[in-house]
Design a protein with these regions (language model features):
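Conserved Rossmann-fold NAD(P)-dependent oxidoreductase catalytic core, especially the SDR/UDP-sugar
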Residues: 252, 264-306
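Beta-strand/loop substructures that line and gate deep hydrophobic ligand-binding cavities in soluble
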Residues: 81-134
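Glycine/proline-rich active-site loop of Rossmann-fold NAD(P)-dependent oxidoreductases
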Residues: 325-327, 338-347, 382-392
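Glycine-rich portal/gate segments that line the openings of hydrophobic small-molecule binding cavities
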Residues: 28, 38-88
Length: 471
């Protein structure tokens, strides 16, 4: 039976390293994007999930092919070890042992051992599996090291209110916050809610994650228990209709309404519950700047022209009303978010993998991008870093012309064909959208991030893609 082993030492006490693995969403946090695994169901049998909990995972192996994994935790020894054993799944057997070894007072080694077997004995298949696990564990340990270095810094049992938690950004942000020791109050969008429902406890450990159905279009403002309201100190507003799709009048109205109205509703929620925020953070967009050919743009530039610029400008004005109940307010002007789970990469992944890649127009317009992992780290850092206030450009410091941007992606996916698509064809579908999103020319500088020495997880597009398709 093949055996995989991986060891890594961390400069942290053994109790801190072990306890990090107890966080409810640790698995979501450390699972590499390219493994395409999501948690379907947890069955916590005790307050310590690692002791005897069961979990069902779904792995997207290829288009339209999803593999189910059913695993249980066993052989738990507090502060020393635990195991995951596959009950059923795509391989014949799978047992993962996690061992924690105290090397000194402030140094701990994690030793992972996985014994597995496939239904068919093929050396190349075993080799492929071993290589894949090597990549995955290198990524896992980078995440663990980062989170341990930030863990429990000024959290004090504070709650973070998150709206839009099920979206692309929120679904990665919540596991990060959970792993760092924050408690989380998720406002779950529900247009049928009366806003009179009570809080639902998602975590069985000391109400670490709670959820509340929220209808921002209702006149009734939801109320939360005073003991939770007093602990709410941060807010992350990620609500808003997806801007992709044909820009009909009704679609554009929904884009505007979903942003302005939900932001007003959030403010009413905060004020009604007498919440005193330390920091409020809102998703904004680089669309604020409009299209500015060959001009470097930073947070000091004025809004541009066009539908997105106008909408974003109005949106930020609504966001700034939070200064009445928050010590700091941040408009996070987010660029093109790179993730295999959604957004641009998910849209183009299939044709690029099939060997057909390209770009629209002459390819000279700049694309301002950011890796999802960097974006969620920036959000968390903004909770406490007083240097971040007002507009903050959440983009990589290395924007690329679209022809270069898509060429790098094509090379990662080994695309054999790389073409230029005349803008005439997509313009036939939605010219305004094409001009404002696909062909918009902005060269945006993350001035505040650079000035305050934010260290990018992925400084270059090549590095970002390594963390999407596999390092």
């Amino acid at each position: 039976m093949p055996e995989f082993s991986f060891s890594k030492s961390f400069n942290f006490p053994i109790n801190q390293v072990f306890d990090w693995h107890k966080s409810d969403l640790a698995l979501e946090r450390i699972t590499p994007p390219w493994d395409n695994i999501k948690v379907v169901k947890r069955e916590p049998l005790t307050t310590n999930f690692l002791k005897d909990g069961k979990i069902i995972l779904e792995q997207n192996f290829m288009p339209l092919v999803n593999l189910k994994w059913r695993l249980s935790h066993q052989n738990y020894v507090e502060g020393k070890s635990f195991e995951d054993k596959m009950i059923s799944g795509p391989v014949k057997s799978w047992v993962h042992n996690h061992e924690f070894i105290q090397e000194s007072k402030n140094k701990t080694k994690i030793r992972d051992k996985i014994n597995f077997s496939h239904w068919i004995k093929i050396k190349k298949l075993d080799g492929f599996t071993l290589n894949s696990m090597e990549k995955s564990f290198r990524y896992r340990n980078k995440i663990i090291e980062h989170d341990l270095s930030k863990q429990y810094a000024n959290t004090n049992g504070y709650y973070v209110v998150v709206s839009g938690a099920s979206g692309l950004v929120g679904s990665d942000l919540v596991p990060l916050l959970n792993s760092l020791g924050y408690k989380i109050l998720i406002l779950k969008f529900d247009e049928n809610s009366t806003n009179l429902e009570t809080i639902q406890v998602k975590s069985i450990k000391n109400k670490e994650i709670v959820s509340l159905n929220w209808n921002p279009y209702s006149k009734v403002i939801p109320r939360i228990p005073k003991e939770i309201a007093e602990k709410v100190k941060f807010l992350v507003n990620l609500s808003g209709e997806n801007i992709l799709g044909v820009w009909t009048k009704s679609k554009k109205d929904l884009i505007v309404k979903s942003r302005l109205h939900t932001t007003r509703s959030l403010l009413s929620f905060i004020k009604t519950n007498s919440i005193e925020l330390k920091t409020s953070i809102h998703a904004s967009a680089t669309g604020f700047y409009g299209s500015n050919k060959d001009m470097k743009l930073d947070e000091n530039n004025s809004p541009g022209i066009g539908f997105l610029a106008k909408t974003t400008n109005e949106w930020e004005k609504e966001q700034n009303n939070f200064l009445s109940c928050s010590k700091r307010n941040i408009n996070l002007r987010i660029g093109t978010v790179l993730s295999s789970k959604g957004g641009l990469i998910k849209l183009i992944k299939a044709p690029f993998r099939l060997g057909l890649a390209g770009y629209v127009g002459n390819g000279n317009n700049y694309i301002n991008w950011i890796l999802l992992e960097d974006l969620i780290r920036i959000i968390e850092r903004s909770f406490h870093d007083k240097a971040f206030s007002g507009p903050v450009n959440a983009v990589s410091p290395t924007p690329l012309k679209s022809k270069d941007f898509f060429r790098v992606i094509a090379e990662k996916y080994n695309s054999k064909i790389f073409i230029s698509i005349p803008a005439f064809f997509p313009n036939l579908i939605s010219k305004e959208l094409v001009q404002e999103i696909i062909l918009s020319n902005q060269k945006i500088i993350p001035k505040k991030l650079l000035r305050n020495e934010y260290k990018f997880f992925a400084h270059t597009l090549d590095k970002a893609l390594d963390n999407i398709v596999g390092i």
